[in-house]
């Protein structure tokens, strides 16, 4: 739900802000071994390794293209708490990779702010009009996304969009602070520009994942 309505549009907005695609996302990335070598090889011990790989490839002078194909993915039977911890991990990944731009996302929750405005203003006419306009724009954006990604089954969930937006704001706030993420049954601490270390019993240790350098890529 959040991936279709928020993540895909945010990736396209990032393309506009950067002037080109300067990142990579997703479980499926395609490139040549020579390009990978020029970018410094695979570096797994980093939060958002897919994003970072695309960033380094762009810095090496190559162009990155978003595929016109959308791969379907299923996170399985997650509990609500598992979904929240996963999205907090994604939020902190974005924060460490995009820096101060992450905090600019505060303006992206107009639907939530309008509902709060209604309560604070006592429901005056101009607040009602502003709220209706904001929600019309939001639903129009969502319907466009549904058509573009060909996901008609999500139409039956449109009623939950207000709840999703409130949840998204909470996750954004949570992701704005802290250096710890939960991934595959363990806590990882993020340091520097995104290097991850395993955290256990109050201590941190290097994540035992080796990078693949240029010499190892044939």
Regions found by a protein language model. Give the residues of each.
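Long helical/loop segments within the catalytic core of UDP-sugar-dependent glycosyltransferases
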Residues: 1-40, 84-85, 91, 157-168, ...
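Short coil/turn segments at secondary-structure boundaries
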Residues: 13-15, 100-105
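Membrane-proximal intrinsically disordered regions of secretory-pathway and membrane-system proteins
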Residues: 62, 190-218
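Membrane-embedded multi-pass helical conduit in multi-pass membrane proteins
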Residues: 105-182
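A broadly conserved detector of short glycine/acidic/proline-rich loop/turn motifs that flank catalytic sites
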Residues: 134, 141, 187, 194, ...
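A general beta-strand register signal
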Residues: 182-185, 189
